[in-house]
Amino acid sequence: YYETENRQKGRKVAVTVSAAAFVPKPFTPFQWFGQDTIEMLERKQKLLRESTFSRKLTVNYHGAETSFLEAVFARGDRKLNAVILEAHKRGMRFDGWADCFDFDAWMQVFKDLGIDPAFYANRQRSFDEVFPWDHLDYGIKKEFLIEECKRAYASETTPNCREKCSACGAACFKGGLCVEKRC
């Protein structure tokens, strides 16, 4: 507040709200969830825009198409190597920058290679599905993530691990000890 010397101080307030689309990520309890479709994300963003009645409130959000591709590559497998290579061959660079991002070009690459990106981004997954990243040992047990996912569906929280060990497996990784030494 005090560092904004060039701004008028007083009762005028401007609020900026940033809302990101949910992107399911590996190694989390939400890796089994499907992402909303692009159409649903755009509908939700439109609702946010139309709900903003004050000029003092700004709502920012990540583009639905960018979020979709983020989910595709976050939950993808080695088949997506061909997509990335082909996109590079077609001159796609710096796609994290809005002025360089061409969603239709990405969709054309997927189509030309016969790969359905919605299979990776939008599909709800079962607990017994084998993920491309399951062979990686990052300390947290998959069984724990499944239980956390079930807790999320039930709107339940997990106790703080400093108060009660949830036996996630993280503290046992590389010889560590859980708070309650359950490992």
What residue ranges belong to the model's regions?
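Switch/connector loops and helix/strand junctions flanking conserved nucleotide-binding motifs
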Residues: 26-29, 69-70
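Conserved C-terminal portion of the radical SAM core fold
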Residues: 1-26, 40-64
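Radical SAM enzyme core and accessory elements
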Residues: 45, 49-183
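Short secondary-structure boundary/capping segments
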Residues: 30-40, 73-80
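Generic secondary-structure boundary/loop-capping signal
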Residues: 19-20, 27, 128-133
